[in-house]
Amino acid sequence: MNSSDVQMMSSQDAPGSAGLAPDNIASSLPSKKKSRRGADPTNQKRRCVSTACIACRRRKSKCDGALPSCAACASVYGTECIYDPNSDHRRKGVYREKNDSMKAQNATLQILIEAILNASEEDVIDIVRRIRTCDDLDEVAESIRRDEKNATATNDNDDSDEPTQPGRDDATSQAVEGERDLARKMGELRIENGSVRFIGGTSHLIYLSEPTDASEEPELETRLSTCDENPITTWTEVTKNPQLIIHLVNMYFNWHYPYFTTLSRSLFYRDFIKGKPAGQPRSTVYCSSLLVNAMLALGCHFTSVDGAFAVPGDSRTKGDHFFAEAKRLIVQNDEYEKPRLTTVQALALMSVREAGCGREAKGWVYSGMSFRMAQDIGLNLDIGSLDEKEVDARRITFWGCFVFDKCWSNYLGRLPQLPKNTYNVPKYDVFPDEDAELWSPYTDAGFDQSCKQPSRTRAIGLQLSKLCEISSDLLLFFYHPSHIGRSSGKSAELKKLSELHRRLEDWRTELPKEFEPKDGQLPNVILMHMFYHLQYIHLFRPFLKYTKEASPLEKVQPRRICTTNANSISKLMRLYKKLYNLRQICNIAVYMLHSACTIHMLNLPEKTARRDITHGVRQLEEMAEDWPCARRTLGIISVLARKWNVELPEEAAIVLKRTDEKYGMFSTSEVPSPNRTAPSLAPSSPAPPYTPEASLLFSTTAAAVLEQQPYSPMTLYSHPTPPHLGPESISDPGMSPNIVTFSDLPDPSAPIIPQQQQNMQAISSLSQNNMLHQHHHHLQNQHQPQQPHHNHMTYQQQQHNLLTHPVSASSMSMSDTLATITAWGIPTSSPGNNNNNNIVSQHPHHQKQPQQQQQPQAQRYPTVGSVGTNTVKPPAAATQTFTPAQLHANNLATATRSTASNHKSVGRHVSPSSIYAIDGQDWYLKDGVTWQQGFQGWDLEGGGAGTATSTGGIGDGGGPTGGAGDSMARLAPRGNIGGGGGGGGGSTGQRQQQQQRQQQQQQQQQQQQQQQQQQQQQQQQQQQEANMFAYHHGAERGGGGIESTGMGMTTVGGGGGGFDPIGGSGLLDDLVGLDELGSLDGLGHLPGLD
């Protein structure tokens, strides 16, 4: 009994289903039995078919194989019934066909392999070429088999003069092969004159034979073995001072290279320390005179040493002498005719330097030359047949050019020159060892080892390149010439807007946490985030043209988005200024800050816009000392303010007026490019002679080190302490007649003079007359008459107290040079000058100042008097006592005297010993030091009331509980950069009482006369504005309070000063006072968040 019989028996015994009568079931059973067991033998059992139809195979149902349509497709599903035996891979026939095909392929490959093995060297090249250019390998194998038969036939019929038919077939085959060669050869890389060049398939140059080695010069293994010159000084003709060269190279690698990563630092240093070859080598080199001079020209913009100026004392000529040498090399040495990797890199650096000097037209030409040459040598293509190090150098150079291109496109509003359809090269690899090398801020005073951290240069560069890809697509759509002046349609714009917005959000989400903007972050990371927010402004700025009714963005306000991101750029710029300083920043920051300031001007007179535009023009003024493009940016903002009829804040207007008078109306035509004749800098002392023994020692040491670790500059030149320049290293008397040293600066701790006391009294009277906010700006911007910026500090005054290893310009040997040059370091000073008398700290306020005679010294650094108060008390040993007003007047004198030192490009960070220093440079606090030292000294049981009369650049810490900060009684003048706001008392008890008293007074005044009531309200408003101004433009941060309870109310203690009004938190965002925390009136109300 089979399974169908069992099924039929079970169906007969089964009870009827619901809704069917037994009679119906009984009557239905014979019909089923009849249909299954009919007289037709074909219906008794489903026949087995070898191939089911495609529809049944897809449904995984049984198919009866009927033609033209099976029963399932015809009766049940009504689908098209198609049979395809070849699509069923389970059939034996299919496997048989595959087996035959594999045998044929095996025979073809066997013929080709045997032909290559048995052919001569000349014929092997021809066979390989035919294999590469063929359409079918079987035809090549058949052709080779016929050739072998023809060769056999020719040997058998030597006497026959009649050509054979296969010979004519071979001629025909060669003709067809030529057609294929012409059609299939798409491009190749070839070496010409020692460099790799790419020739495309449409060029007939591709069929030229490879150049022979006979025309090339033999490779020169020995480099300056008998020359009397330091290898480092062979790269430039401008100076023969090795310390100056190393100093400027370190400036470049410390501040510019991390953002514009366009070369392999390890390969560059490998060739840099060997010196310039005596002749043109055949092998690829990663250092050239053109590249070094371009680096030195850029490095001059981050330093104020004597050798950085082409004309002593003229900041407009920084780096011009090295740039002129680079231009000379391009023209006279025909560098533009020799496509090389180093030339691509040098031209890119020269382009961005020209932009920083306000010569965009020339910089655009240099960038175009760089990008064209990059494509000429095939950097945009993925070439895997080269050495790994060369492949890495080519990739990092291309992606560096890619970043340069996108920055240029954003800067000039032009289309990218390297769009994504022109390259297929992968991104460069991240080497953990290289990214783990420590980075620390480098200034004219040396390295700040307290801020060292992993550099992560390559990892950051990859993130920036991804962001530039988004920027490229944004520019190509919204800023394409075909899109300007006419819309592409709202639907297309919204679709592209949504895509780019999503990509920007994904980039931000996928960004590693270590690259978040935070206190102590790397400078290139901060600039990268500024570029990220700039893309949002560029993305939504085209939608500002729509009115609210016609805007395709119903629930999105483009102006608000642009404002938010402009505010973020301003916050990041303040963070950069706090962590480092704006004298050492890439010039791309000028453009990004300019974009943000433009949005701020549209939002005037809003409070946040007034704050940000004021800080923006002050920051641009600081950057203008090193980057002439910032001077023109200030002029543009001044012109726009008049054109748009915008009322700028008073302090911003004063800054613009001052810069207009100092720099004039900046014009590109007024900034000539340096000529091609580079002025030579005569060294202050003769360059040390190099003997053959010294050269041999250098070569031996270098070879030994390179053999151990050939491509790691940090391991190449390890040094126990940070090296430093000697006193005679960079100072050049012939170039700087007016040298400003720290000893020439007045003593900031000297007491005030009567004239300053009178000025202070005048300030108080103006404050009482409700004119404080006007005179406050005037005091802030009073300074000495403008004069050329002389920052030529000799390294005699800039030695670091930790740098003790002796290397002098006159006694430095080759081995010393190798031991002291690091990827981030410079040679050290001589022992004779490293004494206590000549040691100068990294910070100007730590240096020994001359004492003014006939005047007693005042207390320099304020001490925290009582817990929770901002009133500065003198130490017990002091013989004088000072009122808060006198202390503030002392600060004003300090600010006036320390104006010159504020512009120095030396130390930026506050040392723990001077956490409450009042110097102009120390207007911020280090967060870690603040809470480590300040918190333990607070009395958690209650403290004194914080006041607004801080005498320093910062507000002292207020008590976390107990008395409240005095927000209205005593408003501090600005001191150096503005008196810090009162430290936040935790509770609002006294503030609430004070507020109640004020309300009672207002009620009494209201009962007297309506006119007096209006006058009182106006005075109160002006007083509150002055209060907000004092804290708004005070120190970046006051001492913060903590959560506490006072008089039945719980509130967040106030960290006064800076951008946080009194009563603000001071805890949540105490980096640079980025967000406005707390009540806007400073009366101690429950604070909110920005």
Curated annotation (Swiss-Prot):
Major place of residence: nucleus
Keyword list, A-Z: Activator, DNA-binding, Metal-binding, Nitrate assimilation, Nucleus, Transcription, Transcription regulation, Zinc
Biased composition, class Basic and acidic residues, residue ranges: 167-176
Gene3D superfamilies: Zn(2)-C6 fungal-type DNA-binding domain
SMART domains documented for this protein: Fungal_trans (SM00906), GAL4 (SM00066)
Domain notes: The glutamine-rich domain might function in activating gene expression.
Species for this entry: Neurospora crassa (strain ATCC 24698 / 74-OR23-1A / CBS 708.71 / DSM 1257 / FGSC 987)
Biased composition (Low complexity): 849-859, 990-999
Signal sequence interval, chain numbering: none
GO cellular component, one term: nucleus
Keyword Zinc: yes
Region described as Disordered: 1-43, 145-176, 666-689, 773-798, 825-875, 936-999, 1033-1053
Role this protein plays: Pathway-specific regulatory gene of nitrate assimilation; it activates the transcription of the genes for nitrate and nitrite reductases.
Keyword field contains Zinc: yes
Biased segments, Gly residues type: 940-965, 976-988
GO annotation, biological process: DNA-templated transcription; nitrate assimilation
UniProt subcellular location: Nucleus
Protein name: Nitrogen assimilation transcription factor nit-4
GO molecular function annotations of the record: DNA binding; DNA-binding transcription factor activity, RNA polymerase II-specific; zinc ion binding
Ranges of biased composition (kind: Polar residues): 1-14, 666-677
Record-linked InterPro entries: Transcr_Regulatory_Elem (IPR051615), Transcription_factor_dom_fun (IPR007219), Zn2-C6_fun-type_DNA-bd_sf (IPR036864), Zn2Cys6_DnaBD (IPR001138)
One Pfam family from the record: Zn_clus
DNA-binding region (UniProt annotation): 53-81
